[in-house]
Amino acid sequence: MIRIISFNINGLRARPHQLEALKEKYDPDIIALQEIKVSDEDFPPNIPEDLGFNYYNYGQKGFHGVAIFSKEIPTNTIKGLNGGEDENQKRYIQCDFSTNHGLVSICNSYFPQGENRKHPDKFPYKDRYYKRITNHIDNLNNSIVLTGDFNICLLYTSPSPRDLD
């Protein structure tokens, strides 16, 4: 069994203690992170290495960015969705692992927020992104695990966290 955790960390360098707590409590094989908010050049390798993980990151300074920490070394890593309009936002990373059951792709994404259905730019961008990632996944010829911050709610009437006590 593979134990996978997906976590919007909202700033990797600010929350290594949360990763330590996740590792201690759940002992995951893979941690998929969103909103790492650190460029590839400034990525702190000590954070995953101190936890016993290999790391694969695709980020930029200050916002967005994704990473996969894994105990095993993947056979392949893909950063981005092949040159689309989202590439400057660093929203997708994929690591492929060879297992006893064949190749498994861990696909990790920080999906666009979209604002609301009537927003003239953000919602159409979100719709295009979902179509692109769906097309990408449909073209994979192996098992997948899709992780990430999907930026969706189950029901349109779901309350905002600000409205909850």
Regions inferred by a protein language model and the residue ranges of each:
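N-terminal, active-site-proximal structural segment of metallo-dependent hydrolase catalytic domains
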Residues: M1-E49, F53-N54, F63-V66
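Active-site-proximal beta-strand elements of phosphoester/diester hydrolases
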Residues: I2-G11, L103-N116, T147
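Active-site flanking residues adjacent to catalytic metal/cofactor-binding acidic residues
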Residues: F7, Q34, T147-D149, L164
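Structured beta-strand-rich core segments of catalytic domains in phosphoester-bond hydrolases
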Residues: I36-G114, K118
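Short coil/turn segments at beta-strand junctions that form active-site/ligand-binding loops
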Residues: G102-L103, N141-S143
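A long, amphipathic alpha-helix that forms part
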Residues: F123-N142
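Acidic/histidine-rich, metal-coordinating catalytic segments
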Residues: N142-L155
